[in-house]
Amino acid sequence: MIYKTDYHVHSSYSDGRSVPEDYITPAIAAGLSEIGFSEHLTLFKDPEVWNMNPVNISPYISHLETLRNNVKNIKIKIGLEVDFFAGKEEEIYRFLHPLPLDYIIGSVHYLGEKTVDVGPEFYEGKIIDRLFGSYFDSVLAAVASGLFDIIGHCDLIRIYGYKPSADLEPLYRSLAKTMKIHDVAFEVNTNGRNRPLADFYPDRHYLRIFREENVPVCVNSDAHMPLRVAQYFDEAYDLLRYIGFTEMAVFDKRVRKMVPF
């Protein structure tokens, strides 16, 4: 049996639709060895319905620690999905460093004051090539910051199906090389299949680049409801095997190890 994990799961502590307990049975049924919760944390912005108020960090961690002690058939890992903002690295570090987390996912949602997944209207009237360049620059900065263990949906800018005219291979190559240099993992995020894009992040046409650069990988669902835990995982694992990946990144107390799959 393959050792499978799903580290990108959202509960009602941020924008998920259920309490953490509701995700356990579906995770076990999906054959997961570990499930990790990673609530949205957006510092430097006013709390919104989709992200967790920082004052709730302690209750969130305590809740999951209790759940972990009470559940025996699956390992429960505690994480966060943290928005990256260039120039705020030191403040982010000071906030995160004392927390007893197993991993931290770094994500770029914001370009300016708006998130790239707010709706297709964000892209209207804008130069798509420039947007893609700015987005990848932000992700590169997140990778190089040293703050994160995993980079989440590294090309979320694709969410509504917009495509630049420029060749994207150099952007993906630069991203993969930077991930390898800074020893950061990337995720195959299967939730893109549920968005207008209707495919995984990152773009499957460029996944080979991450393999060629030997970047550690994990498969995550980005589930916001229990029925989407480990969704499309068989397809994702088959795709990774086809490309030549043979190991998966797993995390415990911010330490990564690789397990075969």
Provide a role label for each language-model segment.
Residues 13, 106-213:
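Domain-core and long-helix interface of multi-subunit machines
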Residues 31, 100, 147-150, 244:
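Short loop/turn motifs at secondary-structure junctions
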Residues 244-261:
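Extended, intrinsically disordered, low-complexity segments
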Residues 30-37, 103-108, 146:
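Short coil-to-beta-strand
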Residues 1-84, 91, 95-98, 158-170, ...:
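An N-terminally biased module of ancient metal coordination in phosphate/nucleic-acid-related enzymes
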Residues 81-124:
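Hydrophobic alpha-helical segments and helix pairs
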Residues 35-37, 104, 151, 186, ...:
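Hydrophobic residues within beta-strands of alpha/beta enzymes
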Residues 187-189, 217-221, 247-251:
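Conserved active-site loop/cleft motifs that coordinate metal ions or position small ligands
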